Amino acid sequence: MLTTDYVPGAPDWVDLGSRDTDAAADFYKALFGWEFQSAGPEAGGYGMFQLGGKTVAALGPLQDEKATPAWTVYFETADADATTKAVEQAGGTVRFPPMDVFDQGRLAGYTDPTGADFA
């Protein structure tokens, strides 16, 4: 990513959910020169795309066979639980509730009233 100085509400991460992570990694390597680095077996196939030694995005296998392969945008928040309540109050839905992500913080998934997914 271009910066690590994110304000609440700013996009701070992006990752790709794919049915074929090997094919996706090959495609983005050919397109952008991104190298895929696995996060290890405990990450369930999730890993990081790197360019010039810097992490630029991530890739992981879809967990739901009905899900459509897509890029997900993540937004900075100081409190995932409060954001979850705010999403519901604003008319969005919670796809999955806040959970801990290793030592990286907390993550939750949402859908806005128009059907767009984000986290």
Where are these regions (language model features)?
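Short, recurring structural edge motifs at helix starts
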Residues: M1-T3, D15, L59-Q63
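Core segments of cupin and vicinal oxygen chelate
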Residues: T3-K54, Q89, M99-G105, P113
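Short, structured motif recognition centered on aromatic/hydrophobic residues
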Residues: P11-D15, Y28, W34, L59, ...
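Conserved donor-binding loop and adjoining core beta-sheet/short helix segment
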Residues: L51-T55, L59-A67
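Hydrophobic, ordered structural segments
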Residues: Q63-A119
